[in-house]
Each structure stands twice: as structure tokens, then as C-alpha cells.
Curated annotation (Swiss-Prot):
NCBIfam families: dut, PRK00601.1. It comes from Bdellovibrio bacteriovorus (strain ATCC 15356 / DSM 50701 / NCIMB 9529 / HD100). One of its GO terms (molecular function) is dUTP diphosphatase activity. This is Deoxyuridine 5'-triphosphate nucleotidohydrolase. InterPro entries: dUTPase, dUTPase-like, dUTPase-like_sf, dUTPase_trimeric.
């Protein structure tokens, strides 16, 4: 598996261990909530959860913040803007926007794993303005237009 150096900085609010991959084939690493006290989210509520970390991501890459499947399945908590994008030129604290999609209030505690981060390559588009686009069988159909008999 390919490895790429990514600089990581612990901020003043960080305590605990640095994130690490949990298996040889893992594509993501978990980050933990850095909280002064518990955060309670009622159904439909959202919060920004600090991770206490910032990154220096190599140009041509991004880090994506994704929900942890176990967290979502057990509690209804998920990352709101999935995947959240952390751009290569961002140097601030990574915060995770979580929302409670469940039916009961959920408490997020300090050091709880709140998201998984995945390093991913980025390709920027070079836009070309045209008057017409090529035809396809699908055309302009969208939002449920495919798969019909």
C-alpha cells in the first residue's frame, strides 16, 4: 500500500493519542472528540465537534471526513456534510459536523471516536465553455429516471 507523508499538529485542546490506522488494509483513521464536557444532541440537532488537530496535506490531496458506521448504526449520529472536505491549503482545526438522525437524545463524550478521515487524491477540472454537450441515451433525465423498464 502506498504511503504519503502528512504533517499533523496537536492543538492546545488536544489530549490523548494521535490517530492511527487500525488495520493494514484500513483506508481511514478515527479521530476523537476533544471536549471539555459532554455534548448532548437531541433528535435533529447538530454540533461542531473539535478534534484538536490540524493537518498539512500535500497539494493534490484532500482529507475526507466520513461517518463511522458503528456510531451511525447504534446511535443515529452521522457526519452532516458527508464527506466533509479538508483542503490541502487549510491549516485550521479539523472539526466534525455531526447530526443526530435518531429518535432519542445522544451524548457525545470526550475522547469518543467521532469520524474517520480518509486521505484522497484530488483532480481539478479544467472547464471548457461550449454551446452544446454530446448526446447520451440518458440525456437530461435525472432523479429516478434510470432503471425504468
Amino acid at each position: 500500500m502506498q504511503k504519503l507523508a502528512v504533517k499533523i499538529k496537536k492543538l492546545e485542546n488536544f489530549h490523548g493519542d494521535l490517530p492511527q490506522y487500525q488495520s493494514l488494509g484500513a483506508s481511514g483513521f478515527d479521530v476523537r472528540a476533544q471536549l471539555a464536557g459532554p455534548v448532548v444532541l437531541n433528535p435533529g440537532e447538530r454540533a461542531m465537534i473539535p478534534t484538536g488537530l490540524s493537518f498539512e496535506i500535500p497539494l493534490g490531496y484532500e482529507i475526507q471526513a466520513r461517518p463511522r458506521s458503528g456510531w451511525a448504526a447504534k446511535s443515529g449520529l452521522t457526519v452532516l456534510n458527508t464527506p466533509g472536505t479538508i483542503d490541502a491549503d487549510y491549516r485550521g482545526e479539523v472539526k466534525i459536523i455531526v447530526i443526530n438522525l435518531g429518535n432519542e437524545a445522544v451524548t457525545i463524550n470526550d475522547q469518543e471516536r467521532c469520524a474517520q478521515l480518509v486521505l484522497a487524491p484530488v483532480i481539478q477540472a479544467q472547464f471548457e465553455l461550449v454551446n452544446e454537450l454530446s448526446d447520451t441515451e440518458r440525456g437530461a433525465g435525472g432523479f429516478g429516471s434510470t432503471g425504468r423498464a
